Amino acid sequence: MLMALCALLASCGNNEKNQKTDAAAPVLTAVSPEPGATGVLVSTSSVVFSYDQNIKISLADQSRISITPEVTINSVNAYNNTITVSISGLEYATTYTVEVPEGAVNGFKSSQKAAAVARTSFTTENAPVDPGTDERLSDVAWDLAAALGLGWNMGNHMDAFNGTTPSETVWGNAKCTQATFTKLKQAGFKSVRIPVTWLDKIGPAPGYKIDEAWLDRVAEIVGYAEAAGLYAIVNTHHDECNNDGHWLNILAASVNPDTNESIKAEIKAVWTQIADRFKDKGEWLILESFNEIQDGGWGNSAAFRANPSVQCNVLNQWNQAFVDAVRATGGNNATRWLGVPTYAANPGFVDYFVMPSDPAGKMMLAFHCYDPYDFTIGDAQYSDWGHTGKAGNKANGSDEEYFKALFNKFTRNYVNKGIPVYIGEFGCSMRNKSDSRSWAFYKYYLEYVVKAAKTYGLPAFLWDNGAPGYGKECHGYINHGTGDYMGDSKEVVDIMTNAMNNASPAYTLETVYAKAPKN
């Protein structure tokens, strides 16, 4: 008996010695929208949970994720250290709670515990109001919006590049001419945005001298706009790093202060030269700091989602460096309007945006709008859009009420307070006119968006890449070399210029809505 007891005790001791300790469970580090966030756009399409390590979640556990009050969960995607819950159908002024239940999220270590429950709540924005019902403290932004009106983006042109070398014609467009801009004015456009990529047209440190011939050509094109009586915007465009090694690398700057200081020095040097070249031009010329600064993930990378304020704060610093450089050149640059974008030019990240300090007090906020993506520029290319569109033929969300809410947020928080806001890019892939249904919804979308922009005091710049035909990436309206209409674009351009320029009290956003294509 004694021997048996000793054997049993020895066996228990060995079991305790051989027992493995479970690895620590994955720990939640961040959620977007942030817990307790208010004013969240009803267009918000995802809730992202970030953990301290790479994680996984089974299909069965994905189905256990809940959102209360109930809305549609379109998909759940685990990638690296994040879980993205794609949603649609949020309502105004509603508090939602999203829960990933205990045990659903697991790591990849052996003998590892599952994660604890992850829960977050946020409240959506209030329902949109007509812009006139908010107190308008200043007419400055409204007046500038009227002056800029409907603008034209000369896309895939001076922003085109091969490798690291910018070239006006490398992406297939002919060199622009004075006729291009003269005919734009005749078509009803009031302004042009001239995206410019600089890349290796910038010399080495410390001078960063810009190639004279390239700057001369930019100045010549700006002169075309001046001669045509158009407002013009000039920027730095594809210098941003989109996983391609370009110099405006916000990810590198966000993790290395020395890199950030080096990039800011180059920003100041580049913009000092550009601004100096144009310091005698009138207020019809606007300088825009950047295009769509982001880390290659368009706001969805693990690095960004872990703490969006980190990269957004870097962009805020870069925008300030731009303003300081331009103002220091003097002349008309001391007081001209300057434009600065949100992160990725995405309106959804405006809460992280800080307007640069400006002694002249003449700053403009820029964002881009290609919503809904699956209708405008994505692969799906749905045929329908809006309240009369047929389910299954249109993208989820981003109907008429979405645009009213989105635009009104900028009107209420900026425009009515005297801070101009402009939609630096918008548009939709051309549709085939022979498909009468698709053509009708295409025209309706562009008319509604432009009329909404007009209603809420936002000038809007149509993206035109010069690509003929119809379908994805076909955004050709005006021949860049001649200014002539492309294909069936005149019908669409006339609709948009009328939406922006027609001030008749009988032509309103409501009358456009009422004329939506019949299902």
Predicted regions, residues:
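An active-site-proximal structural segment forming one wall of the substrate-binding cleft
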Residues: 172-191, 209-236, 242-289, 316-330
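Active-site region of glycoside hydrolase catalytic domains
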Residues: 261-399, 405-428, 455-458
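C-terminal motif of bacterial Sec signal peptides marking the signal peptidase cleavage site
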Residues: 8-11
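Acidic/histidine-rich helix-loop elements
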Residues: 154-176, 204-210, 374-402
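N-terminal carbohydrate-binding accessory modules
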Residues: 127-191
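Short, surface-exposed alpha-helix to beta-strand junction/turn motifs within ectodomains of secreted
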Residues: 43-76, 103-106
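Aromatic-rich peripheral "rim/lid" segments of glycoside hydrolase catalytic domains that contact
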Residues: 433-519
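Acidic, Ser/Thr/Gly/Pro-rich low-complexity segments and short DxT(G/T)-type signature motifs
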Residues: 19-37, 92, 102-128
